[in-house]
Amino acid sequence: MRILVLGLGNPLLGDDAVGLKVAALVRDRLKDVPGVDVEEEEAGGLRLMERMTGYDRVVLVDAAVTGGTPGEVRRLAPDDLPTQRTATAHGIDLPSALVLGRQLGYPMPSEVTIVAIEAESVLEFRHDMTPAVAAAVEPAVAAVLEELARARGERGAI
C-alpha cells in the first residue's frame, strides 16, 4: 500500500503554513517507514490531483478557516468540503479534483483524509503562525500519525 502525507500551505501567510510545518515534522518522525511518502505542496487545483495520483491513501494537512476556534484540529473527508465554482481549472477544489482524476482514468486514492487545523488568519503576510495555531502543530502531527496507523492497520500512532 502506498500512502502520501501531503502538507499544504503558503509559508508567507502565517497560519497558512501550518500544513507545511506539520508535514516536515511527520517526515522527520517517519524516516524509516516504508510505503509512506511525506511531501509539501504550495499549489492546489490540478497540481493537487497530480500529486495524489498513484497512491492508495492520502492524508492532506492544511489550514482551514471555518469560523471555529483557532488551533482546533479536525479530521475531515473530501465530502465535508464545499465545492467551488472557479473560472479556471487551476482553482479546482479537492472534491472536483478527485472526480476529474477518476474520470480521466488516473489511479486516484481510494481514501483521502484531511487533517484540518483551524487558522486565525491566512491572508496576512507574516513568517510566523499565530500562537493558537503554532500550539496546534504537535496535536496535528499526532492526528496524522494516528491516521497513518489506522490506514496501515496498526494499533496506536506510528
Residue ranges and their predicted role:
Residues 2-6, 11-83:
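Nucleotide and nucleotide-moiety/phosphate-recognizing core
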Residues 7-8, 68-71, 87, 117, ...:
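Residue-level signal for pocket-adjacent positions within structured domains
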Residues 63-112:
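Helix-loop-strand module that forms the ligand-binding subsite of alpha/beta enzymes
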Residues 27, 53, 80, 95, ...:
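A generic membrane alpha-helix/interface feature
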Residues 17, 21, 43, 68, ...:
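Conserved active-site and cofactor/substrate-binding residues in soluble primary-metabolism enzymes
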Residues 20-24, 49, 95-98, 141, ...:
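Predominant activation on well-ordered alpha-helical scaffold segments within soluble catalytic domains
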Residues 97-158:
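Phosphate-binding/catalytic loops
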Residues 14, 85, 89, 128-132, ...:
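Short alpha-helix boundary/capping segments
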